[in-house]
Amino acid sequence: MTNLKAQKRLAASIAGVGINRIKVVEDYIEDVQSSLTRDEIRNLIKDGKIIVLKKVGISGGRLKERRKKRSLKSEGKKSGSRKGKKGARANSKQMWVKRVRKIRAYLKWLRDHKVIDRHTYRELYLKTKGGNYKGVSDVRNVLIQMGKIKG
């Protein structure tokens, strides 16, 4: 076998790929061996006497299949795989909306059952909107302090 190391190196440099992706067609080995300049090598690549192979990737098909099966079973999502806190993983806006809805429902129930008057309701409602209360229990504590309900 003839030594085409220099020609392959030049072809790789011209094509911008590694040496392993350069292949010389068997019928044109003599032509390639006689060419020494970058211009000659460039012409050989154009003529198809030197072939630049396509990049070989890694197939992700099997991995996708495995991941899909795991996601269908909800694997890898339980407490052992979680690194962040609940607040880091959950959408903070959704958490806020959920909390505010609970508090508002509680306030509405209190107003409808005549536990608090509409002025107190409005005051607490606006404070809830402003983010004063962490939850329903916080609102209960405030109402106990106000003397509106018994502890």
Swiss-Prot record:
Gene Ontology BP, a term: translation
Region (Disordered): 62-93
Keywords for the protein's UniProt record, in alphabetical order: Ribonucleoprotein, Ribosomal protein, RNA-binding, rRNA-binding
Annotated signal peptide: none
One GO term describing the cellular component: cytosolic large ribosomal subunit
InterPro entries the UniProt entry points to: 60S_ribosomal_eL19_sf (IPR035970), Ribosomal_eL19 (IPR039547), Ribosomal_eL19_arc (IPR033936), Ribosomal_eL19_CS (IPR023638), Ribosomal_eL19_dom (IPR000196), Ribosomal_eL19_dom1 (IPR015972)
UniProt-recorded Gene Ontology molecular function terms: large ribosomal subunit rRNA binding; RNA binding; structural constituent of ribosome
Disulfide bonds: none
Basic residues bias spans: 79-88
NCBIfam families per UniProt: PRK08570.1
Protein family according to the UniProt entry: Belongs to the eukaryotic ribosomal protein eL19 family.
Cited function: Binds to the 23S rRNA.
Subunit structure: Part of the 50S ribosomal subunit.
Protein name in the entry: Large ribosomal subunit protein eL19
Organism: Saccharolobus solfataricus (strain ATCC 35092 / DSM 1617 / JCM 11322 / P2)
